[in-house]
């Protein structure tokens, strides 16, 4: 084991204590700068440093410092590499966790919605007559509420989430630590009216009940599409496959990235019609640049998710 010995040799030490230096013979100080008046101008407090190796061979202090510096440089590099690996594994685990939750909720809602539609109209047709008016009302409200949710989300995003509810929505604009974020609560909040409308429309007969049932279906479909495009395609919380190469979805993803960059005072606040909002504020050039950047990132990504 190498160790360093440093001592300040002075005449006082050897005359007062009369002890020998460790690991060496008594030296003749006649030629030393402290005894010889010819060299008295030399520094009396010269510090001698050496590194003794296990095999007895001396090593210069500069070489020892260089070796130590190399070790210190190597340590952070290895630690950083290890941290990158751990962070990558953690992100993969978070994506798997969120993917399982997203798929479970999506499949669950899809199955329940399909079963509800089938059993509701089967129950309505027990008398033999096909309720065409009610069916058309249900279908119309399903489409209308899905489209209307885009405008509701745009208004709520601008007027609520970025103002009074920013303490919750802020988690979506910061790096995420874990598979979920506080902003996910908004998905649960929007699910309550959808479930209530579906339940009321399912257990009651009549045209109004059919409209409520259709509205609940539309909100549910929009929520599933929003989660798949916003969380999967834009923020890559789970893989979405080849839809990232579809031009329309490239516009959607690029427009939402511009929202996070806050280049146009937060515009666009909507998701599926975000490129239309950018067109109104003159942001199409920025949108084209963001699309090219996104395509380049997707092409260079090993997962291409």
Curated annotation (Swiss-Prot):
A motif (Histidine box-3) lies at residues 230-235. Its EC number is 1.14.15.24. Keywords: Carotenoid biosynthesis, Chloroplast, Hydrolase, Iron, Membrane, Metal-binding, NAD, Oxidoreductase, Plastid, Transit peptide, Transmembrane, Transmembrane helix. InterPro entries: BETA-OHASE-like, Fatty_acid_hydroxylase. GO terms for molecular function: beta-carotene 3-hydroxylase activity; hydrolase activity; iron ion binding. Its main location: plastid. Residues 146-272 form the Fatty acid hydroxylase domain. A motif (Histidine box-1) lies at residues 157-162. It is a multi-pass membrane protein. It is found in: Plastid, Chloroplast membrane. GO terms for biological process: carotene metabolic process; xanthophyll biosynthetic process. The histidine box domains may contain the active site and/or be involved in iron binding. High expression of beta-hydroxylase (BHY) and zeaxanthin epoxidase (ZEP) results in the accumulation of violaxanthin, 9-cis-violaxanthin and neoxanthin in the yellow cultivar Gower Ramsey, while the down-regulation of BHY and ZEP results in the accumulation of beta-carotene and orange coloration in floral tissues of the cultivar Sunkist. Belongs to the sterol desaturase family. Homodimer. This is Beta-carotene 3-hydroxylase, chloroplastic. It comes from Oncidium hybrid cultivar.
